C-alpha cells in the first residue's frame, strides 16, 4: 500500500471498533505502542474543533509569545499529529515525534478510550477543545470534500446521517467529547470550548498558559491573541496547511481554514434536519453536565 492511489478516497478502515482513515489505520501498532514522555503536552480534539488553532496557541506560549519562532516551520512539523500517515507523501506522525526534543506538543483526534495507554500512565498534560456538534458536522463535511485521505462525503443530507451515527473518521462526536470530559476528574486535562475562544481569545490563552505553568507578560498575551486570530492564521503559510500536497488536500475545493465562525450550521441545516438532530442530541447527551453553545 505504498502508492497514493492505494489509500486516497478509500472507505474507512476500523481500529479498535472506531472508523479510521485508511492511510492512518495501516500499521496502527506504531500508535498503540507509542511511548509518551512525562513532559509531553497533548492537544486532543474531535476533528474540525479548532485543533490547529489551539496547537498554534500552545506552541506560541512555549515560545514566550514570539511569532517569529512560530514561523520556524509548518504547524504539521512543529505539532505533529500522532496517528497521521500518508505513505510515500509525508512522514508518519509517530516517526516525527520520536525524533523531536522535549517538550513535545502532540496533536491527536484519537478518542480517550483508545488513546495510547502511555499518555495516561505518565499523567501527560492534555488540552482538549470541544466545539458544538452542528458546526463540527458542517466543517467536517467541507473538510471531507477537499481531503482526499477521506472517502467522498456524498450529499450533505447523507453526511449528516453518517455523522450522527458515528460513521465518520474517529467515530461518534458524542462519545469523543464525553470521553475526555469524564476523564478530567482523574487526569490533568484542561477542557476548553471553541465558542469561548471565539468570544474572548485572550482570556482562554491565559488559561492555557496557567495550566502549562508558563508566566506570560501582558504584551506576550496580546501578541498571541493577535497572531492566533482566524485571519492571521488563514494568511500564515506555516498554519494554513498550504504545505500539504494538493494530491492529499485540494484547497481549490474548500480551504483548510474555511470560515472559523460559530453558527455557520444555520446556513446548512434545514429546519427539519435541525429538529431531528436536536432530538438525537438530547438522547446521546443525556446524563452529562457537558454543555455546548450553538451561538455566541
From Swiss-Prot:
Annotated catalytic residues: 109 (proton acceptor)
InterPro entries: P-loop_NTPase, Sulfotransferase_dom
Matching Gene3D superfamilies: P-loop containing nucleotide triphosphate hydrolases (3.40.50.300)
Enzyme Commission designation: 2.8.2.1
Any one GO BP annotation for this protein: thyroid hormone metabolic process
Binding positions for 3'-phosphoadenylyl sulfate per the UniProt entry: 48-53, 131, 139, 194, 228-233, 258-260
GO cellular component: cytoplasm
Superkingdom of origin organism: Eukaryota
Subcellular location: Cytoplasm
Binding site for substrate: 107-109
Pfam families: Sulfotransfer_1
Reaction equations catalysed: a phenol + 3'-phosphoadenylyl sulfate = an aryl sulfate + adenosine 3',5'-bisphosphate + H(+); 3,3',5-triiodo-L-thyronine + 3'-phosphoadenylyl sulfate = 3,3',5-triiodo-L-thyronine sulfate + adenosine 3',5'-bisphosphate + H(+); 3,3',5'-triiodo-L-thyronine + 3'-phosphoadenylyl sulfate = 3,3',5'-triiodo-L-thyronine sulfate + adenosine 3',5'-bisphosphate + H(+); 3,3'-diiodo-L-thyronine + 3'-phosphoadenylyl sulfate = 3,3'-diiodo-L-thyronine sulfate + adenosine 3',5'-bisphosphate + H(+)
Keywords assigned by UniProt, alphabetized: Cytoplasm, Transferase
Gene Ontology MF annotations: aryl sulfotransferase activity
Main location: cytoplasm
UniProt enzyme class: transferase
Function: Sulfotransferase that utilizes 3'-phospho-5'-adenylyl sulfate (PAPS) as sulfonate donor to catalyze the sulfate conjugation of dopamine, small phenols such as 1-naphthol and p-nitrophenol and thyroid hormones, including 3,3'-diiodothyronine, triidothyronine (T3) and reverse triiodothyronine (rT3).
PANTHER family: SULFOTRANSFERASE SULT
Family: Belongs to the sulfotransferase 1 family.
Name of the protein in its database record: Sulfotransferase 1B1
Amino acid at each position: 500500500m505504498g502508492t497514493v492511489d492505494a489509500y486516497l478516497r478509500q472507505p474507512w478502515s476500523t481500529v479498535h471498533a472506531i472508523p479510521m482513515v485508511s492511510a492512518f489505520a495501516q500499521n496502527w501498532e506504531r500508535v498503540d505502542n507509542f511511548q509518551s514522555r512525562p513532559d509531553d503536552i497533548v492537544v486532543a480534539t474531535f476533528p474540525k474543533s479548532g485543533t490547529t488553532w489551539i496547537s498554534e496557541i500552545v506552541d506560541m506560549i512555549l515560545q514566550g509569545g514570539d511569532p517569529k519562532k512560530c514561523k520556524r516551520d509548518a504547524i504539521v512539523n512543529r505539532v505533529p499529529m500522532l496517528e497521521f500517515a500518508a505513505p510515500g507523501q509525508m512522514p508518519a506522525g509517530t516517526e516525527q515525534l520520536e525524533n523531536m526534543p522535549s517538550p513535545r506538543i502532540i496533536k491527536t483526534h484519537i478518542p480517550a478510550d483508545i488513546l495510547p495507554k502511555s499518555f495516561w500512565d505518565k499523567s501527560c498534560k492534555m488540552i482538549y477543545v470541544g466545539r458544538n456538534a452542528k458546526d463540527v458536522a458542517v466543517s467536517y463535511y467541507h473538510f471531507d470534500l477537499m481531503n482526499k485521505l477521506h472517502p467522498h462525503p456524498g450529499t450533505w443530507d447523507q453526511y449528516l446521517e453518517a455523522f450522527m451515527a458515528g460513521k465518520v473518521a474517529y467515530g461518534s462526536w458524542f462519545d469523543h467529547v464525553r470521553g475526555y470530559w469524564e476523564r478530567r476528574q482523574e487526569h490533568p486535562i484542561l477542557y476548553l470550548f471553541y465558542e469561548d475562544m471565539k468570544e474572548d481569545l485572550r482570556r482562554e490563552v491565559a488559561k492555557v498558559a496557567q495550566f502549562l505553568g508558563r508566566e506570560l507578560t501582558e504584551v506576550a498575551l496580546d501578541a498571541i491573541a493577535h497572531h492566533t486570530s482566524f485571519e492571521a492564521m488563514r494568511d500564515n503559510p506555516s498554519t494554513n496547511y498550504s504545505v500539504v500536497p494538493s494530491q492529499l488536500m485540494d484547497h481549490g475545493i474548500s480551504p483548510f481554514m474555511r470560515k472559523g465562525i460559530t453558527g455557520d450550521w444555520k446556513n446548512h441545516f434545514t429546519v427539519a434536519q435541525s429538529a431531528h438532530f436536536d432530538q438525537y442530541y438530547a438522547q446521546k447527551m443525556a446524563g452529562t453536565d457537558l454543555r455546548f453553545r450553538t451561538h455566541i
